[in-house]
Design a protein with these regions (language model features):
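Intrinsic-disorder/low-complexity peptide segments enriched for small residues
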Residues: 10, 15, 38, 44-47, ...
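N-terminal secretory signal peptides
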Residues: 1-30, 48
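Soluble extracellular-acting proteins and domains
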Residues: 58-226
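A general structural-boundary detector
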Residues: 22-23, 43, 82, 158
C-alpha cells in the first residue's frame, strides 16, 4: 500500500492505492511509450497528443483538463480555440476512498452504491453488497473476471486481479460520467467502450482503429485530471 498526498484548493488530498496501482500511476512515461507503440500509433494525431505534457501536468491531452471523446480524438482536430471541452473526472483512487468505508461516505452518485466495509477497506474482499459490476456491464466474454465483483471491489482488485487496471478505470469513468464531470463521455458511452472490449478484446473509436486494454486506460486517464 502506498499513500500519496496532493495539494488541491488549499487542502491535502489523500490517495490510497494498492502498491501496483501507485507504481502504474508513477510510470507515466512508460505508459506514453507503450501508447505510442500500440495500434493507436496508426494515427499521427495520437502520436502528437502522446508527445504533449503528461496527464499529471493538469490532466487531459495537452494539460489543463482538456479532453476529447474517443471519436473526437481520432478526428485530427487539435485546435484549442473556441470552447474546448474540459473534464474534471476523478481517479479510481478517489472513488475507492469516497465510498461506504472512505473519509467521505456515500459520496457515489445515484443509482450506484459502494457497499459497506468494516475494516481494511483497501482490500477488495472486505467489501460487501454494493452495485454489481455485471449489473452495469457485460461480463460474458473478456470481462468475465469481473463477473462476481461489485463496482467497489473492482476498484480495489489491484493489478493482478485487474490487468492494466481496466476495470478500475472503467468504474471511475462510469461514476465520473454519472456526476457530469466528463462532458465528452456519457454513461452510455462508457458502457459501450467496456462492452465492446468484452465482446472483441478491443474497442474501435473509429472504424479500423483498435484500442486494447492498455490503450483504453490511457484514454480514460485523460478524462481524470483531478
Amino acid at each position: 500500500m502506498k499513500t500519496t498526498k496532493e495539494q488541491q484548493n488549499g487542502e491535502m488530498k489523500d490517495n490510497n492505492l494498492p502498491q501496483d496501482v501507485a507504481n502504474q500511476t508513477e510510470s507515466v512515461n512508460e505508459s506514453r511509450r507503450r501508447f505510442a507503440k500500440s495500434s493507436l500509433a496508426v494515427s499521427g494525431v495520437l502520436l502528437t497528443l502522446a508527445s504533449r505534457p503528461s496527464l499529471g501536468s493538469g490532466g487531459g491531452f495537452g494539460g489543463g483538463g482538456m479532453c476529447k471523446s474517443p471519436s473526437g480524438l481520432m478526428s485530427g482536430n487539435l485546435s484549442v480555440h473556441g470552447s474546448p471541452q474540459r473534464c474534471s473526472g476523478r481517479t479510481p483512487g478517489y472513488w475507492g476512498n469516497h465510498g461506504g468505508g472512505g473519509p467521505q461516505p456515500n459520496a457515489w452518485p445515484s443509482p450506484y452504491l459502494p457497499g459497506s466495509c468494516q475494516k481494511k477497506c483497501t482490500n477488495s474482499s472486505n467489501w460487501s453488497n454494493g452495485t454489481k459490476f455485471s449489473s452495469v456491464f457485460n461480463c460474458n466474454g473478456n470481462g468475465s473476471r469481473y463477473n462476481n465483483y461489485s463496482l467497489m471491489q473492482v476498484l480495489w482488485l489491484g493489478g493482478r486481479g485487474d490487468p492494466y487496471q481496466l476495470g478500475a478505470h472503467i468504474v471511475a469513468a462510469l461514476l465520473n460520467a454519472q456526476k457530469g464531470w466528463t462532458p465528452v463521455l456519457t454513461v452510455a458511452q462508457v458502457k459501450n467502450i467496456f462492452n465492446e472490449w468484452n465482446d472483441k478484446g478491443y474497442f474501435e473509436p473509429t472504424a479500423g482503429i483498435k484500442w486494447y486494454a492498455a490503450d483504453i486506460v490511457y484514454y480514460l486517464k485523460s478524462t481524470m485530471p483531478e
